[in-house]
Amino acid sequence: MLLLISPKNIEEAKEAIAGGAHIIDVKNPPEGSLGANFPWVIEEVKNITPKNLLVSATVGDVPYKPGTVSLAALGVAVSGADYIKVGLYGTKTYYEAVDVMEKVVKAVKSVDKNKIVVAAGYADAYRVGAVDPLIIPKIARDSGCDVAMLDTALKDGMSLFDHLDEKLLKEFIEETRSYGLKSALAGSIKKEEIAILKKLGCDIVGIRGAACSYGDRNEGTIQKELVEELVKLCE
């Protein structure tokens, strides 16, 4: 299972790289769960990341505005990200979500067909009015994405497992795999929960809080030693 660590700046990215993270995921926590960082930060992180590692970046917790979102996704792609993650926050239906992601895929793949597009839903979608998390695999498949992901929209101490049980997560992973896509799971994942995700067959686990000092995604900073510990748990 690959470990995706989400730094917010160059200093944290260096810690994530030194700790052995497999994917360096640039985000901006003050702007939300999948808050978008700035193009120059993505570019700086790409420049210091070893060639054998891939860089990911978030487009944001996006509205249902396919034009705006596809243009933003293009910006993420040309800034150097290999993975382009879109948080389907303002899309309320399957059709709206597919509409957004189709346009993102078209924009991103026009730059480089090898770029990896991630459709990200929210396990706690019912709290924010977003699209049903359990149809994210179909949305990813039908829009031409490469990865189906779940995170949590609200970072208030509740984790992925507080909203979806192991049975539902296993179904999500297996459905995603049946479409030939990769699965990614995140959402205030605790280090003791990594073994569960590994057992379920998850391809990528996304972490920020558990890699930060004090376990705090906002006030803490990513620490090399914590990343090393998480990497071992994923192996």
Swiss-Prot record:
It comes from the Archaea. It catalyses: 2 D-glyceraldehyde 3-phosphate = 4-(hydroxymethyl)-2-furancarboxaldehyde phosphate + phosphate + 2 H2O. Keywords: Lyase, Schiff base. The active site is at K27, K85. CDD domains: Aldolase_Class_I. It is an enzyme of class 4 (lyase). GO terms for biological process: methanofuran biosynthetic process. One of its GO terms (molecular function) is carbon-carbon lyase activity. Catalyzes the formation of 4-(hydroxymethyl)-2-furancarboxaldehyde phosphate (4-HFC-P) from two molecules of glyceraldehyde-3-P (GA-3-P). Belongs to the MfnB family. This is (5-formylfuran-3-yl)methyl phosphate synthase.
